[in-house]
A protein has these predicted regions:
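C-terminal and inter-domain tail/linker signature
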Residues: 1-142
Length: 142
């Protein structure tokens, strides 16, 4: 791993932009042609970040206006890769049976694997989460 590349700092900047609902700031940290995959959408759900995952990033703050992001743990790996445990959420717009009631504030655990190129730009972002809660939020936004 390059000593000059601080992937932890770049990752913190990415999640700070997400917390601030600054999708343009998030995209600025992604390489051209960067790919992402949100695994609960299926193992073959890889898509471009620009025009793909970007839509999801823009959508959650609309469904959950006080949407926020908190990094719980950040682990630097090999080859400019980072694993992140984060809590994402806010005031729930719908009941999530057994998890949270409509109007309550909750954050849903997410796990990210983020890979960077030598220039410090995200080239790949994979994410895992509890899909039951997310499905309820998506349904409420329709």
């Amino acid at each position: 791993m390059s000593n000059a590349l601080d992937v932890k700092a770049i990752t913190k900047k990415f999640f700070a932009a997400y917390d601030a609902h600054d999708v343009e700031g998030m995209l600025a940290l992604c390489a051209d042609g960067a790919q992402g995959r949100y695994l609960p959408y299926g193992k073959n759900s890889a898509m471009p970040i620009r025009g793909g995952l970007e839509k999801i990033w823009r959508g959650f703050p609309q469904a959950v206006p006080d949407f926020g992001v908190e990094i719980v743990e950040l682990i630097e790996g090999e080859d400019n890769a980072v694993t992140v445990q984060a809590l994402l959420g806010g005031t729930m717009p719908a009941d999530v049976p057994g998890v949270v009631n409509k109007g309550e504030i909750d954050r849903i655990a997410h796990a990210y694997i983020i890979r960077y190129n030598a220039d410090g730009k995200i080239t790949r972002l994979d994410c895992y989460w509890d899909n039951t809660a997310i499905t309820a939020i998506k349904a409420s936004a329709l």
